[in-house]
A protein has these predicted regions:
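Macromolecular interaction modules
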Residues: 1-213
Length: 213
């Protein structure tokens, strides 16, 4: 995150009060082997209607930067965990030197498992590429991750932002891409927006609440 390559990310999704989560849960995960840093986040657009989630919605997100020694713990009641490893391709975007204070979290899977690599190639060489080229204000690095052990959601696109209004930045992204590739009724836009065997599992915006030292 920010100015470093993170081998893996472990996410926890919860409706628990964020102060309680930060006090009781964050230290327990940080104490595990392979965990380097933690941040915790507030969902700023819960129950969004434009991209309704397949995964259960949640209020707060814990993000743990982990290395290859990490093994995901059993999540306590009221918490759902997802362990992702950095995909072998690089992230795209810019490093501004400012802290990551906003996120756009995108979780996707292939409808047909046999097309997983085709979906991954589309995401890297078409979808994320055009977003990075659009230079969306507030957007920094966009990094691909793959779920450890397979299953759903298969891939994570982790959009880091240096703006404290991540939802506004997210909503500005598609119009800026349209300026580059064409309107929503063009083949170019459809190719960008609708990947092969794409199943959108979750999309939302998050604002940072706190971080470990």
């Amino acid at each position: 995150m920010e100015d470093r390559i993170t081998p893996g990310l472990y996410l926890e999704m919860t409706d628990r009060a964020i102060d309680e989560y930060a006090r009781d849960r964050v230290p327990a995960v940080l104490a595990r082997p392979g965990v380097q840093r933690a941040t915790w986040w507030r969902n700023v657009k819960r129950d969004r209607a434009d991209l309704p989630p397949v995964l259960p919605e949640f209020d707060h997100l814990g993000v743990y930067e982990v290395d290859d020694a990490f093994r995901a713990p059993e999540a306590p009641p009221g918490v759902t965990g997802h362990h992702f490893r950095h995909y072998r391709r690089p992230g795209q975007g810019i490093v501004t030197g400012r802290p990551t204070v906003g996120l756009s979290l995108v979780l996707i899977s292939p409808k047909d498992e046999s097309r997983a690599q085709e979906l991954r190639d589309w995401a890297d060489f078409v979808h994320i590429r055009h977003i990075a080229e659009a230079a969306v204000p507030g957007y920094c690095m966009i990094t691909p991750y793959e779920r450890v052990g397979g299953g759903d959601p298969r891939f994570m696109h982790f959009y880091e932002m240096d703006t404290d209004d991540p939802e506004r930045a997210f909503k500005s992204m598609t119009p800026l891409v349209i300026e580059r590739i064409g309107a929503t009724d063009t083949p170019e836009f459809r190719h960008w927006a609708f990947g092969p065997s794409l199943r959108i599992m979750y999309v939302n915006s998050f604002a940072r609440v706190g971080a470990s030292s």
